[in-house]
């Protein structure tokens, strides 16, 4: 009887434990596979996340652009400072920007000291030249030399005493009791005695000699 029942069950399909286990294993495998398939779409960002990421990227790009513009401004400033340094290499007139004027008093003994007066005038300094201790001929030569240099520099000259002269650059105005001295007063050169060897004979004198 048992054999008949078992055969009948086998024929009907009631005794299929293996198939049930196989189906169970198959369903269990599908359960393991299905969560993986569900996790895969979860990795795709949603619209809100994409918008937030886009905002972050826009902010990052704006920050980068601001940094680049700041760097560009700094570059321009550095370039301008570089130009300022180049301009600082240009030598200006001494004493013209500091608002201070300087007066140099010279009491030369020889004519070889006269270039000091010209050098001081080129440095925009006034010169008081005291020639009382010099030989008269050397003193006249010194005055002519310094006066020529002052005239070349568009300066001014004024006699302030016996053998004492004031030479000023063009940036200095000289005022006296009579008024403002705008033009350079030339010194009176000493009359030169013509050399007898270079005397020019007049036609009448030549006729008398003949």
From Swiss-Prot:
Name the UniProt key words of this record, in alphabetical order.
Cell cycle, Cell division, Cytoplasm, Septation
Q: Where is this region: Disordered?
A: 36-69, 182-210
Note the Gene3D superfamilies from the entry.
SepF-like protein
Where is this chain compositionally biased, Low complexity type?
36-47, 59-69
Q: Which residues form a coiled coil?
A: none
Q: Which family does it belong to?
A: Belongs to the SepF family.
Role: Cell division protein that is part of the divisome complex and is recruited early to the Z-ring. Probably stimulates Z-ring formation, perhaps through the cross-linking of FtsZ protofilaments. Its function overlaps with FtsA.
Its recorded name reads Cell division protein SepF
**What is the protein's species of origin?**
Trichodesmium erythraeum (strain IMS101)
Encoding gene (name): sepF
């Amino acid at each position: 009887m048992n054999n008949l029942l078992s055969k009948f069950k086998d024929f009907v399909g009631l005794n299929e434990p293996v198939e049930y286990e196989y189906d169970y294993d198959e369903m269990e495998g599908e359960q393991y596979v299905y969560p993986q398939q569900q996790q895969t779409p979860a990795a795709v960002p949603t619209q809100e996340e994409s918008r937030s990421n886009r905002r972050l990227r826009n902010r990052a790009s704006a920050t980068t652009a601001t940094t680049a513009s700041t760097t560009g401004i700094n570059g321009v400033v550095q370039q301008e400072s570089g130009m300022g340094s180049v301009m600082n290499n240009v030598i200006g007139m001494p004493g013209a920007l500091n608002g201070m004027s300087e007066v140099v008093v010279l009491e030369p003994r020889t004519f070889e000291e006269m270039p000091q007066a010209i050098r001081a005038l080129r440095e925009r300094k006034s010169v008081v030249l005291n020639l009382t201790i010099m030989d008269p001929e050397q003193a006249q030569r010194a005055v002519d030399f310094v006066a020529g240099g002052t005239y070349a520099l568009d300066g001014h000259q004024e006699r302030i005493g016996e053998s004492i002269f004031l030479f000023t650059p063009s940036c200095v105005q000289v005022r006296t009791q009579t008024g403002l001295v705008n033009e350079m007063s030339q010194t009176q050169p000493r009359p030169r005695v013509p050399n007898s060897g270079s005397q020019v004979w007049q036609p009448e004198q030549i006729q008398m000699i003949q």
